[in-house]
């Protein structure tokens, strides 16, 4: 996949969306890990441009997608697993809203994050995304649902 770059300093609004239930509790300190990412991004872009919200259930994604559309969020950081990412992409695509999306892996398998070479280590992750490296992802669709890596029967 071709790599390009974007200047994250030009983003007006960044939203971190994290799923507190992803990862089957593999990361007992998940909120602490995600909060550290939030603090680091906030220190780069400033408090007024950076916000964080948690997903209690996938149904919350409808309201989050609406918020992203209304507030014209430039960059969404998804802290979750493959299921969270897929569900989020499905909702945001329906809004015809396409912010830059980064993945901070906190799921069980994290296949999407692995394919994008995203580290689970906070400092390495922030260093990479702060460089503004963009990797296009091509969505697939089967039985009316979006998929990013694999689909099955």
PLM-predicted stretches and their roles:
Residues 15, 44, 55, 94-153:
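Catalytic core of DAGKc-family lipid kinases
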Residues 75-78, 100-102:
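Short, conserved beta-strand segments within well-ordered enzyme catalytic domains
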């Amino acid at each position: 996949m071709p790599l390009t770059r974007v200047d994250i300093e030009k983003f007006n609004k960044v939203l971190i969306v994290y799923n507190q239930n992803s990862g089957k509790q593999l990361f007992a300190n998940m909120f602490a890990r995600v909060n550290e990412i939030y603090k680091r991004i906030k220190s780069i872009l400033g408090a007024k441009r950076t916000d964080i919200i948690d997903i209690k259930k996938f149904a919350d994604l409808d309201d989050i997608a609406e918020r992203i559309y209304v507030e014209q969020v430039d960059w969404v950081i998804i802290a979750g697993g493959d299921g969270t990412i897929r569900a989020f992409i499905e909702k945001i695509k329906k809004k015809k809203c396409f912010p830059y999306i980064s993945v901070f892996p906190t799921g069980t398998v994290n296949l999407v994050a692995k394919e994008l070479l995203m580290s689970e280590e906070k400092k390495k992750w922030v260093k990479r995304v702060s460089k503004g490296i963009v990797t296009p992802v091509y969505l697939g669709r089967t039985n009316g649902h979006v998929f990013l890596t694999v689909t099955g029967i």
